[in-house]
Amino acid sequence: MPAADDGTPAALAGRVVLVTGAAGGLGATAAHACARAGAIVVLLGRKVPKLNRVYDAIVNDPAGLPEPVNYPFDLAGAGYDDHAELAMRIQAQLGRLDGVLHCAADFAGLTPLEHTDPAAFARALHVDLTARWWLTQACLPMLRQAGDSAVVFVVDDTVPGAAYRGAYGIAQQAQLALLATLHAELAASPVRVSALRPGPMRTPLRARAYVEDQDLRARDPARYAEACVRLLAPQGAVHRGQVWAPAP
């Protein structure tokens, strides 16, 4: 069993965790942190070469981490049946699922709603809200089988009604409603739901709205990787039903 530096069992030892957007800024570093914490990580993302880099970083870690599983998947184009098939494949290959970390997001850049491309609006709303729910819904039967499991939504710090964020900004607020509803409905179940609201991070997504060398507030996403692990681990129970905004 993987152990922490002090010899105690690692926080996610024996668990299987699905990370969406696993090749992205936060997703990649969070996936590696989950593996360091003892989890078998299912790496979900669109681009195979980028997923392979995350996979290689984990399997080549000198600590000898559990081997992850690559699952190329396009959230924007997948139907609900594709999400259900993903859940069935995890069940067949790994036999369990203990956590889902939603890092994948779609944001085309700052644009007035009036001038937003209709297809881009629909895509962002789907990836940032509908696909997150579809995947959660498909995985709930497996998550219920675990004695303790977690669904974690990574949300932005976008102020409600902030201009030019388009469907991305709207989806951020809708996710909070989804979180509250799921928390109420799953209160008596072993499935915990919570959200992580990291501070500004230096990621390709944020670069679509800010000039990097002028974005003095942004931090390395690695600063929030351990927060992801905490919410997925049993210790995350203290944040059940909440939006956690840890200090960087």
PLM feature spans:
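Rossmann-fold scaffold of SDR-type NAD(P)-dependent oxidoreductases
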Residues: T20, L97-A105, D128, F153, ...
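Rossmann-fold cofactor-recognition segment
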Residues: D61-Y80
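Conserved mid-core segment of classical short-chain dehydrogenase/reductases
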Residues: A76-A84, M88, A105-A122, Y164
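C-terminal helical subdomain
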Residues: A188-V191, A195-L196, T203, V211-P248
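Catalytic loop of short-chain dehydrogenase/reductase
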Residues: D106, W133, R144, D148-A188, ...
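Catalytic Tyr-X3-Lys loop
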Residues: E114-W133, V152, Q175
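Conserved glycine-rich cofactor-binding loop
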Residues: V16, A23-G24
